[in-house]
Every structure is written in structure tokens, then in C-alpha cells.
A protein has these predicted regions:
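Short, charged/polar connector segments at secondary-structure boundaries
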Residues: 5-127, 131, 137-138, 183-189
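Glycine- and acidic-residue-rich phosphate-binding/metal-coordinating active-site segment common to enzymes
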Residues: 116, 120-123, 127-188
Length: 189
């Protein structure tokens, strides 16, 4: 586990952190290109159409596991990040300055503002707050507060959709977001 220890209120290393995050982003980008994979964040608007959705459900404020935050809601921000949410824009950009400021804020007082995200099939796609997710993933945070809207797919015979419907029952009862179902019938156990 990678942990950085600093005194509260005196951290001002955002530019250095951005340089390190940029290296991680470019490394991920190159690795995905070499494998013939899409090197940027997945975009929810490109993955599904409204015709696939039965309804939307406001989930309110949820503590979302960062491992389950996998993409962005719209195409607008996708080219700013590699697929691992690390930045790929040059250090001389306004984006880099904002990312660096968020990094300093995280180390000095913590990022407290929730992001806005869509949840689809137990994965989260960021509507607002991509840089906050990036900074927290860089610092290996476990979760992030999010105001979540769930996009519920139409019920079908598709195994993953049926599994997801079982997960939603479990989630409604427990409120847990960090559980993945891999086998039908486990929700009742």
C-alpha cells in the first residue's frame, strides 16, 4: 500500500503529483494502444442508448468504491484521461493547474464535494467530477461520495442483466455498493 504522510495544511506539491500522474496516464495509454484497445475512458453515452433503459432511479448520496468508477458519462472529458483515469494532457494546460490544485486540496483538507455519476450495471460513469476521481485514484483512495442516478436496463434473458437485477435487490436491502454478483441465486442467501 502506498501512503503519503504530510502535515495538514502545508502540502503544496500538486505540480509534482501531476507529473507523476501524467506518467501513469501516458504509460496506460501506450499499453492500451499496443494491445489494440481503446486508450481513453469508456463513455456511457457510447455504451448504451436510452432504448436499452427501463427507467432511471435517483440513488441520492452514495459512497462509491473507486474501483467501480470506470468511465465518464459524455464524450467531453474522455480525451483528457487514459483508461485508468490518470491525466494525459500536458503540464502547461489549465487542466493540469486545476488537477494540481485539487491534489493539494486533497492532501491539505480532503476532497469533500461529491461527484455526480450514473450507475449502470454496477459500474459508475462520471457526469461531474472527473478530476476529483482522477486525484483520488492517484492517491489510492478507496471510495468517493457521489450523487448517483441509476440507469436500470430493461429486464431480459441476458445473464448479466438478470444478475444485475439480483444485485439491485441486494443493494436495496443492504445499501452496499462494493459487492459484485457472479452467480444467479446468491441474492437470496
Amino acid at each position: 500500500i502506498y501512503v503519503k504522510i504530510v502535515s495538514k495544511g502545508d502540502y503544496n506539491m500538486g505540480e509534482t503529483e501531476y507529473s507523476e500522474a501524467l506518467k501513469l496516464g501516458k504509460k496506460e495509454y501506450r499499453a492500451r494502444i499496443a494491445k489494440g484497445q481503446f486508450p481513453y475512458l469508456p463513455v456511457l453515452d457510447e455504451i448504451l442508448s436510452e432504448a436499452d433503459i427501463k427507467t432511471e432511479q435517483n440513488m441520492g448520496l452514495v459512497q462509491v468504491p473507486l474501483d467501480f468508477v470506470v468511465g465518464t458519462s459524455t464524450m467531453g472529458r474522455t480525451y483528457s484521461f487514459a483508461a485508468n483515469f490518470m491525466p494525459i494532457l500536458d503540464e502547461e494546460t489549465e487542466f493540469a493547474v486545476k488537477w494540481s490544485n485539487l491534489s493539494d486540496a486533497q492532501m491539505n483538507e480532503g476532497i469533500r464535494d461529491p461527484i455526480k455519476a450514473f450507475e449502470y450495471m454496477n459500474r459508475y460513469y462520471v457526469l461531474e467530477g472527473n478530476k476529483r476521481v482522477s486525484v483520488l485514484k492517484y492517491f489510492n483512495a478507496v471510495s468517493i461520495p457521489a450523487i448517483v442516478t441509476r440507469k436500470i436496463p430493461k429486464l431480459s434473458d441476458d445473464y448479466d442483466v438478470r444478475l444485475y437485477y439480483e444485485y439491485m435487490k441486494f443493494n436495496e436491502i443492504t445499501g452496499l455498493c462494493s459487492v459484485e454478483f457472479t452467480k444467479l441465486g446468491n441474492a437470496d442467501k
